[in-house]
């Protein structure tokens, strides 16, 4: 079948391997993006190329080694699986994937799609919530190649997404007697919201509202937090790791944690949440720390992606 329409799924990216040099190369590209670190280049680049890229890669490499599998990066493996499953569901499209940082590169994959005869491409960033730090870099990269390509900005309000998210939590929540559900989102600097008008915080809050409403949770049964703080700047609060340390002292000994901003396991879920935060919780007197994994290779999530594409198709045609 000659497919003239294409879907390009885009995830953040991952180092080629968990070796220090590959991690350094990845971090240099990621942290060097002016949309990710919004500081004057003359100030930030010497810091990045100085102490950060000398110290952080080795530390990050050790973290990656704890989550690396025989297939390599979990994020890469699950993104490939999501792509293959979506292709199986949408034979009317040529479905491929790319990474914002690292390989396969967005520009390369789009060129390959065009060369194979795909004329109408829709780019779907694998982030339910829009942010200047995640979706916007994809939009900017795509614009440089072809400003007519449509990029879907977010899908946090798609009901099938919040239904699936609630369902993934409900099974564990009902089977165990947890004191609290923690909905932990990747954080961003506060100034990106207050000064740059990033919609991310509002979309995260809306996601939490929709999910806890579906779960029927009372206000005291859940918390909304932000993880992965980097650098001295003030970030969105409360910080997940701070609350995780405080909760046992508030007689909250059994928690279930979920990270709705991630649709596939990666360093932030497998190491930061499931290992690092769990250790902090237990060290401070916590007893049960369970984790709801992202959707990963769930066929039900692939169906959500298909619905997102279909809704976008209708909106574009209208």
Swiss-Prot record:
CDD domains: Ferrochelatase_C, Ferrochelatase_N. One of its GO terms (molecular function) is ferrochelatase activity. It holds the Pfam family Ferrochelatase. The keyword rRNA-binding does not apply. Pathway: Porphyrin-containing compound metabolism; protoheme biosynthesis. Keywords: Cytoplasm, Heme biosynthesis, Iron, Lyase, Metal-binding, Porphyrin biosynthesis. The keyword Oxidoreductase does not apply. It is found in: Cytoplasm. Involved in coproporphyrin-dependent heme b biosynthesis. Catalyzes the insertion of ferrous iron into coproporphyrin III to form Fe-coproporphyrin III. Belongs to the ferrochelatase family. This is Coproporphyrin III ferrochelatase.
